Regions:
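Domain-level recognition of soluble alpha/beta enzyme cores
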Residues: 25-91, 113
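Short substrate-entry loop that stabilizes the transition state in hydrolases
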Residues: 71-86, 91-131, 269-272
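Short glycine-enriched nucleophile-adjacent loop
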Residues: 151-154, 177-189
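Short beta-strand immediately N-terminal to the catalytic nucleophile in serine-hydrolase-like folds
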Residues: 170-172
Length: 353
């Protein structure tokens, strides 16, 4: 019987891989990318939104997400969009080295190949020359960036006629995962946010930066932090290692009405406390939860270039940015994550196609 079960498991894995290839062929091998502005009254700026989409031949070849540490992913700048109408995934990035939309090109590009349009705003303050701990910790502003991105996509002449506006979901990784939960209806507890960096127990890397930047979370104006950021246009959210989950009002999870898929990277007991989502999965009425045991929180980064770990040490990057589990390469973990995301969004927002 055990041998029979193994055979069935192997056949199922082969069938699933075949299905993913078939789904990809139903999309487009060409992926276009373009920038659009998303005006934000609250931020007082136009958000820079990167959009990946199924494309026809054309455009200029570009590589997005490449850095001294990470490999990039190719796409075609301003290529013509493919015929048809497509579901929309609003993508929220994390902070730090992966604190920009292009850092997630490794997942956005294959999603476009599978027939999704993926739009990701650059959340202000999270990376680059304008990196700011104070702006990064205004977590309650991030869901508004996602809503403004959706508003901009609805008005954009290039995209507006080719999107299925009743088929919109949000995908978030790390801090983007907590953003996805907030746009689904989870509310921040201002006191928990103020207390978040009182110790290093929850997020030593982030909180060290906050303190070194001279930011006192207790002194921040948190009067709007607990507001309702739910956007009812969103049909489904998926959060991968959402962080920080410790700043939410736990009771608000029970009021989330849309389906939610939560994924943690790592084995139970080794998942960062601030990203551990098993308890909130039980609190959300329509949630699923899974783990990828041989991954780590850093598996959400693009594939590391040769020598990246040594460069990180030289640059005094303390996080093990190139460390995954011990049994698989990051590329294999990425393939599994991409397949999980494609399956989830195909089920929840692309079901009519």
């Amino acid at each position: 019987m055990k041998r029979l079960n193994k055979i069935w498991t192997m056949l199922w894995s082969i069938a699933l891989s075949t299905l993913m290839v078939q789904q990809a062929s139903g999309g487009s091998e060409n992926v276009g990318v373009r920038q659009i502005p998303a005006p934000s009254k609250e931020r007082g700026i136009d958000l820079d939104v990167t959009v990946w989409y199924p494309a026809r031949s054309g455009g200029k070849s570009v590589t997005l997400g490449e850095s001294v540490f990470f490999a990039g992913t190719p796409s075609m700048r301003d290529a013509p969009i493919s015929d048809g109408k497509f579901p929309l995934i609003l993508l929220s990035h994390g902070a730090g080295l992966a604190g920009n939309p292009q850092a997630l090109s490794w997942i956005a590009t294959p999603l476009a190949k599978h027939g999704f349009v993926v739009a990701a705003p650059a959340h202000p303050g999270n990376t680059g020359t304008n990196r700011s701990a104070a702006e990064t910790m205004k977590l309650w502003l991030r869901p508004g960036d996602i809503s403004e991105t959706l508003n901009a996509m609805e008005k954009d002449a290039f995209f507006k006629e080719q999107l299925e506006y009743d088929e919109v979901g949000t995908l978030g990784l790390s801090m983007g995962g907590s953003t996805a939960l907030a746009i689904a209806g989870a509310r921040i507890d201002p006191k928990r946010l103020a207390d978040y960096c009182d110790t290093d127990a929850l997020n030593p890397s982030l909180c060290e930066w906050v303190r070194q930047s001279g930011v006192d979370l207790h002194a921040m104006d948190l009067r709007s932090a607990g507001r309702d950021n739910e956007d009812r246009r969103i049909r489904f959210v998926m959060a991968i290692d959402p962080a920080p989950v410790d700043v939410f009002d736990f009771n608000s999870f029970s009021k989330i009405s849309v389906p939610v898929e939560l994924v943690n990277l790592g084995q139970p007991g080794k998942i960062p406390l601030t990203a551990e989502a098993s308890k909130i999965a039980k609190a959300i009425p329509n949630a699923t939860y899974s783990t990828i045991g041989d991954a780590s929180h850093y598996s959400m980064f693009a594939e590391c270039k040769p020598g990246a770990s040594e460069i990180a040490e030289t640059e005094k990057v303390r996080d093990p940015i190139c460390m995954d589990g011990v049994s698989r390469a990051r590329s294999e973990i990425h393939t599994q994550l991409i397949n999980m995301v494609v399956a989830a969004f195909s089920r929840e927002v692309k079901s009519s196609h």
